[in-house]
């Protein structure tokens, strides 16, 4: 049975840059090159291989914004060329999760349609990027365990660290958020000290980190989503490596709408 659609995330630009040296050599010898030559040894090779073998009618890939500038733009050039070589028409856009959750999280969305089916005539449109509708205070629990409050030692360290880099003209430091604003991007390393997103507290208490449940809300997961079967460390990692659920849902709905219209 034909694979109707393929959805994937994190093709991982932490892979080594795609090499074009071998491709150039083959071309100089008059030999054919293909996506396997350009992407061999990268995670994207697996994605391209699945698409090549199963020919889904459409696919939807998500990755970090820096994919477009990685390796001076060569990485995205190879990815785009590879997908077009496989005869897919592409639509791509950098979108910010803050349209759906109180978090600044820019990601590139890549949607492709099989040219043999849609002939490049699909009327796909990305969902409108709305103004932020939620603030950090909307995801916070009123009663939070004391273990999420920073110790005096850690709080002093973070302040001294930030001051040291501020004196050098660097921008490194903790992220003490405004309750009426949005947060920085949640990363998988949040479990280490929580410094990228700190919540101010009253009564002279040190700031606190988000709980795993609050992190899940920051990614758009409903409270019915279970987190109690893993440790806090693993929950933080999973949330930091995840996607903004309502954003992915909105793009997916547009993809399905386009497929049904053709």
Predicted regions mapped to residue ranges:
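Short, small-residue-rich loop/turn micro-motifs
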Residues: 13-15, 22, 190, 222
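C-terminal target-recognition/interaction regions appended to catalytic cores
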Residues: 150-262
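Single conserved hydrophobic/aromatic residue that forms the stacking wall/gate
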Residues: 1-9, 13
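Conserved SGNH/GDSL esterase-like catalytic core that processes O-acyl groups on lipids
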Residues: 9, 18-19
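Proline-centered helix-kink/hinge sites
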Residues: 14, 56, 102, 222, ...
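Class I S-adenosyl-L-methionine
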Residues: 19-185, 189
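Gly/Ser/Thr-rich beta-alpha loop segments that engage phosphate groups in nucleotides
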Residues: 14, 24, 114, 242-244
């Amino acid at each position: 049975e034909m694979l109707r659609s393929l959805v994937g995330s994190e093709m991982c630009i932490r892979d080594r840059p795609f090499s074009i040296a071998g491709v150039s050599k083959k071309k100089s010898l008059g030999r054919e090159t293909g996506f396997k030559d350009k992407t061999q040894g990268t995670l994207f090779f697996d994605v391209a291989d699945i698409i090549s073998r199963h020919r889904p009618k459409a696919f939807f890939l998500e990755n970090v914004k820096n994919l477009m500038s990685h390796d001076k733009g060569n990485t995205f050039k190879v990815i785009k060329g590879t997908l077009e070589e496989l005869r897919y028409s592409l639509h791509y856009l950098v979108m910010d999760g803050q349209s759906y959750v109180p978090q600044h999280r820019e990601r590139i969305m890549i949607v492709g349609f099989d040219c043999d089916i849609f002939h490049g005539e699909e009327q796909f449109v990305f969902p409108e990027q709305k103004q932020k509708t939620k603030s950090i205070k909307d995801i916070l629990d009123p009663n939070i365990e004391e273990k999420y409050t920073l110790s005096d030692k850690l709080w002093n360290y973070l302040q001294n660290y930030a001051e040291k880099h501020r004196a050098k003209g660097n921008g490194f430091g903790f992220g003490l958020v405004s309750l009426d604003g949005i947060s920085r991007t949640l990363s998988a390393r949040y479990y280490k000290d929580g410094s990228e997103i700190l919540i101010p507290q009253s009564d002279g208490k040190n700031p606190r980190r988000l709980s795993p449940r609050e992190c899940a809300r920051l990614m758009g997961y409903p409270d019915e989503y279970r987190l109690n079967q893993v440790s806090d460390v693993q929950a933080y990692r999973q949330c930091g490596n995840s996607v903004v659920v309502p954003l992915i849902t909105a793009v997916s709905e547009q993809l399905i709408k386009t497929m049904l219209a053709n």
